Amino acid sequence: MEDDFLVLNIREYIKMGKAGEDMLRQVFSSFKCEKNLDVESFLTEQSIDFTKKNQSVTYIVISPDKNNIVGYFTITIKPITVNTDEFSNTVRRKIARVSEQNSDNGKYSLSAYLIAQLGKNYDDSIGNTISGDNLLSIALGKVKELQYMASGMVVFLESENKDRLLDFYEKQNGFKRFETKVTKKYKENSHTLVQLLKVI
């Protein structure tokens, strides 16, 4: 199914200068995600700057038939600290190979791939052309390409604390919870995010 979609690194547009960035903004203008406005605003307002500053890289997913953006994802690398007490021995051993353990608390510190954004386009004009499973699978495929070139073994993401989303990541896609954090971006709307990881 992933082969049915075109996945483009937005650097390909950015390297063309202003004309390329204008093209990107035109593509972004058709992306709608009313279920999570932060996902929509990141793409339209921040993804270009973050990519230019090497803070993260955003990939857009295009349907080949209608040439519409059906989704996007953003990847970066971040340090994490993991308590592996609830993990299987196999997962624990794999994490231990690429991390340092704190002798005081037993937690592991490591660098991991972060899928920082994952968003579907809910614009009515394009229809429901990609599933969440397919979009996540495409993002994980891109992480595995990076793994092939630069090593690494762990990918993680942050989810809102909602059963529907957590079931999607845990039951359907094999991620495991390892921490929670309270967002500090908007104090008046602060909320808890659940951090989940997967060994790849």
PLM segments and residue spans:
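Short strand-loop-helix active-site module centered on a catalytic nucleophile
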Residues: I138-V143, K162
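Glycine-rich acyl-CoA binding loop
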Residues: G127-A139
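His/Cys-centered metal/cofactor-coordination and adjacent catalytic loops
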Residues: S159
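Non-catalytic substrate-recognition and accessory regions of acyl/acetyltransferase enzymes
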Residues: M1-G127, G141-F156, D167-I200
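Conserved short alpha-helix immediately C-terminal to the canonical SAM/SAH-binding motif I
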Residues: L135, R164-L165
